[in-house]
Curated annotation (Swiss-Prot):
This is Leucine-rich repeat protein soc-2. Interacts with let-60. The keyword Transmembrane helix does not apply. Residues 1-17 have a biased composition (Basic and acidic residues). It comes from Caenorhabditis briggsae.
Length: 559
């Protein structure tokens, strides 16, 4: 079960075309997706790449034509994106009616000073160019609200930006910026600041003056500290600090009482300030990949809206102090890759909304006696622990759909496993199983059964009842035979039988698996089948079984 993506802090999605971010960011401004009716990229007759004329004269002529059309129609939006222009001619100054100008994905290295005469401009999109500076004339754009400079070559925030005090949304992601000046405090109307994926080492204290700031995205930089003044940004709902070099958070973080999401994954944080308990609007607590050994007592209990808890890849040796109450609102818990050796009895007794629990890669040796009370869970990952026994109460997890128990020390499965009627995926790789219970045949919705790298000698005939099974992995066991009932698996697409040193025969009924696309038989002797057939691969083996057995009239649609 893959969990890392599920628990990832995702304030915004990006594509190669630099679409505007989604979520709160998207609601602030979604202009990057809009296309104007005068976009040159949609007009073949005005294509800059057309033949005839010099490389400079042709685009200049086309742009002038577009400027004329725009002025004649008094259009307020002009899109000149993705046409490989390297410069903007000065007559653009005549388009004073423009409120939106898009110049995405071109080859601009500079802008003309005349752009400062577009005094009605509210949105200016310059993403995916080669800009290293901006003209001072942009300070005249007193109506400009949104400025997108993602994917350029800026090494600093151009000084003129600090003079555009009307700005509400500022995108500077994917540049080479090393610092943000104290003058950022001039942007009193700024609601969204995106400086992700730069080389910034610290934020200025003046950031505390941004009283309107709602979203602050600073991930993938080199921050070593966050100024205490961040606590003055009372409007903040999203603060993304993930993938930096932070060793601590400021105590003032507790003043951000409107905070809904805080991303601090992949830092070097050793402790969380208890003041965070004042952020009672928080819905996600994601601190993956830090150096936490514990949390402040009752921290999660004081955060009543938390639905996602991700404490994975830290140095925890026990569950957070706070008892069952701390998980009342929680839907997803990920504590993968820690040093936890025990699940306290009753810890999930009030977690009636809990659907996903990941305790992979810990030091668990047993499961609590009240495991049967985890009835809301649909996905449970306990792989890479030291479990030797599954409690019979596992049958009470009636909503379980995915169960991952790989890389433990299990010697047998309880027969009650057959009562998990909703189970779709069962992963038992790398254990010490010698048998599979007959009751496995009751799992009518099972699509994936992985039991490779065990000590299994035989399979129950009931395996033929798994009508939904698509992926069956039996490699690296001690199998001596495969039951003929395997021929009933009409949905089976992949079958792994590799590295079974005592497996000499395959049932002719295998030829009835008409959906079979992949079969691995490497390092299994299969003396029943001629070497030249096995050398030809799975497809030839299936055809051989079909021709040699009693099913030679069956048409193999999967081959």
């Amino acid at each position: 079960m893959e969990t890392s993506k599920e628990f990832e802090f995702r304030p915004a999605k990006e594509t190669s075309r630099s679409k505007s971010p989604g979520g709160i960011v998207g609601r602030l401004s979604n202009f990057a997706r809009n296309k104007a009716r005068h976009s040159l990229s949609e007009k073949g007759s005005n294509s800059v790449g057309g033949s005839g004329g010099s490389g400079f004269d042709k685009p200049r002529k086309d742009l002038l034509k577009e400027f004329h059309k725009c002025k004649e129609a008094q259009d307020q939006r002009l899109d000149l994106s993705s046409i490989e222009i390297t410069s903007i001619p000065s007559p653009i100054k005549e388009l004073t009616q423009l409120t939106e100008l898009f110049l995405y994905k071109n080859k601009l290295t500079c802008l003309p000073t005349e752009i400062g005469q577009l005094v009605n401009l509210k949105k200016l999109g310059l993403s995916e160019n080669a800009l290293s500076s901006l003209p001072d004339s942009l300070s005249s754009l007193e109506s400009l609200e949104t400025l997108d400079l993602r994917h350029n070559k800026l090494t600093e925030v151009p000084a003129v930006i600090y003079k555009i005090t009307s700005l509400e949304t500022l995108w500077l992601r994917y540049n080479r910026i090393v610092a943000v000046d104290e003058q950022i405090g001039n942007l009193q109307k700024l609601k969204m600041l995106d400086v992700r994926e730069n080389k910034i080492r610290e934020l200025p204290s003046a950031i505390g003056k941004l009283s309107s700031l709602v979203v602050c995205l600073v991930s993938y930089n080199h921050l070593t500290r966050v100024p205490e003044e961040i606590g003055e940004c009372h409007a903040l709902t999203q603060l993304d600090l993930q993938h930096n070099d932070l060793s601590e958070l400021p105590y003032s973080i507790g003043k951000l009482t409107n905070l809904v999401r805080i991303g601090i994954r992949y830092n070097k944080i050793r402790c969380i300030p208890s003041e965070l308990e004042s952020c009672q609007q928080l819905e996600e607590f994601i601190v993956e990949s830090n150096h936490l050994q514990l949390l402040p007592p009752n921290l999660l209990t004081m955060l009543p809206k938390i639905h996602t808890v991700n404490l994975s890849r830290n140095e925890l040796t026990a569950f957070p102090a706070g008892g069952p109450q701390q998980f009342v609102p929680t839907v997803t818990i990920n504590m993968e890759h820690n040093q936890i050796s025990k699940i306290p009895i009753g810890i999930f007794s009030k977690a009636t909304r809990l659907t996903k629990l990941n305790l992979k890669e810990n030091e668990l040796v047993s499961l609590p006696l009240d495991m049967g009370s985890w009835t809301s869970i649909t996905e449970l990952n306990l792989s890479t622990n030291q479990l030797k026994v599954l409690p019979e109460d596992i049958e009470k997890l009636v909503n379980l759909e995915i169960l991952v128990l790989s890389n433990n020390q299990l010697k047998k499965l309880p027969n009650q496993i057959g009562n998990l009627k909703k189970l779709r995926e069962l992963d038992l790789e790398e254990n010490e199983l010698e048998t599979v219970p007959t009751e496995i045949g009751f799992l009518q919705h099972l699509t994936k059964l992985w039991v490779q790298s065990n000590k299994i000698v035989t399979l129950p005939r009931s395996i033929g009842n798994l009508c939904s099974l698509q992926d069956l992995r039996l490699g690296e066991n001690n199998l001596t035979a495969i039951p003929e009932e395997i021929g009933h698996l009409d949905s089976l697409k992949s079958l792994y039988l590799n590295d079974n040193s005592s497996l000499h025969n395959l049932p002719f009924e295998l030829a009835l698996c008409q959906s079979l696309e992949i079969m691995s038989i490497e390092n299994s002797p299969l003396s029943q089948i001629p070497p030249e057939i096995t050398a030809g691969g799975p497809s030839l083996v299936i055809q051989y079984l079909k021709m040699q057995g009693p099913y030679r009239g069956v048409v193999m649609t999967g081959q």
